[in-house]
Amino acid sequence: MPESLTPIKSTGSPAHRPHLVLCFTALLFAFSTVAVHAQDVHHPPDYTSIVVFGDSLSDTGNVADLSEAKYGVRIPGPYADYTDGRFTDGADTEPAAENYFGVWVEQLAATLPAKPEIKASLDGGTDYAYGFAFTGDGTSVFSFGTSDELSVVVNNIGQQIADYLATHPKITDKTLFVVWGGANDLLNATSEDDIIDAGINQTLNIQRLVDSGATQFIIPNLPPLGLVPRLNGSPTTSVPATKAAELYNQVLAGGIAVVRDFNRDRHLKLAQLDVFALFNQIIAAPSSYSLVNVTDSSQGMAVDPDTYLFWDSLHPTTRGHDILATTAAEIIAQRECREHSDAAGLTDPHADCAGEVAVETSGAKH
């Protein structure tokens, strides 16, 4: 979000809980009560739907719907130099994107055989993400300025999941779940405990979905936050932000490992998208991605945004989203390759099947 869209407070940010990391297993044991039938792991599903929980990186219109209902103007939208409903560029922004459209989950859906529709939940779709969502329960106040005079109340990720489960009691293995958040928690954190809380919250969000029958996941971690335009100008802001992202990612990775181990009889597919490593790779070698600028925002500038990584001070361009989508699609393809290799009894699977966390973007447009 640009500096004019400044978050001011959250009514649902996590409370301090002592000894959180040591309580992972106990929490998950108390949290898990629902039996799930194992699926045939030899035949990966053709995803017919994608359900998204997250923040502004995945929002496709929920915040814009709220602002339109309250103020008669869609923000994000052309009024604030964003493509309609999304915190990124598009054909209706200045400058305009020419080659890409939509946030990463929309672009990911377009690569899948069934091409599942991505639409904001307030419009009847399955994208429950809201800009400025935190990882916890409840709601947050998202301000469009420096005070709460122009603001909307958004659902945090825990609340997003609760809303989804309230109307979707049955989950099939043809549904891919995306759970991505944490940046707003970190940008508003006042202590290391706040960062750890965010990772714990996200772990419990994932386990709650598993308890309800979800088995197919894409779970991105956070990029090095100190490298975004808002924070990359000085070591005093960039270094702590990146260290916070590293800590959050460590807690999340540990939590995912616990979820995987605790539910090993359920054949979960918890694919982790290593955005931290991916962004470091992009910024180290931008020309490999046909990018010319990976440090500044392109919003309102006389530049080609398709050659920039960032649109505003925090969010990627649609080209940046394209790289994320391509990487996520490769993770899915690698997973299918490994499972088909296992089913065929191959002892030396194809090299493309190696590893679960993809960082390369060989399928991206160069």
Can you annotate each of these PLM segments?
Residues 1-17:
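N-terminal secretory signal peptides that target proteins for export/translocation
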Residues 7, 16, 26, 340, ...:
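General secretory precursor processing signal
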Residues 16-19, 37:
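Low-complexity, intrinsically disordered or signal/transmembrane-proximal segments
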Residues 19-22, 343:
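Intrinsic structural disorder/low-complexity segments
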Residues 21-32:
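Bacterial N-terminal signal peptides
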Residues 38-366:
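Conserved active-site regions of diverse hydrolases
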